[in-house]
Amino acid sequence: MEFKYPEAIVECDWLLNQLNNDNVRIYDCTTILHYTDDHPDKPYDVESGYELYKKSHIPGASFLNLQNDFSNNDSKFKFTLPNSDYLAEAFQNHGIGEPFHIIFYSRNGMQWSTRFWWMAQYLGYKKISILNGGINEWERLGMPTESKSNSYKSAKFDASVNDRIFVDKEYVHSSMNDDSSILINALPEDLHRGQNPRYGRPGRICLLYTSDAADEVAGGG
């Protein structure tokens, strides 16, 4: 299978050869969800992955705290996208921007690194890639790690917002009977089928197709 955007994914062997490249900046995006399935009004507690980062990370990597620094914490929902000015400043302050090639990775799942990839895309920054397999694959291959914390100097970030990256519920609702739109549920099948009440109201958006994406990604599909 050929990827439409092959530059969006890099392999561990490639990154190993870039560790001394000053134009490559690496970020651990790990976030941990502690599910509280008996409390549907609060389906999970969020924990930063910083403690895991301190134990082991790719040499030179800095850490990004998704909930604290890259979300709208005035929202009642976790991980709500902040306004573009705030987000651009957060990226810039953490060293993300010109002229650097940014590598995002996470532990125990790709969804955290892909979230940062999408947010950077939303602001128009294109020099970004995701480490295929994350740090789990890096460690499986026996590649070097370290435990000291790292940070990068701020970078120049000129945002050019792409409003087609994220949409609101009104847009989704209006697209439900639009033959040119496809809705895909990337959550596990038990949530799609309404067999798991984790998020309070079981089930899915009508007319939705599930791709079992979580299983496919975990299995390399």
Q: Residue locations for each model-derived region?
A:
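A structural signal for short, well-ordered beta-strand segments and their strand-loop junctions
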Residues: I26-D28, F63, I103-F104, S129-N132, ...
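Terminal peptide-recognition signature
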Residues: L15, A61, A120, L208
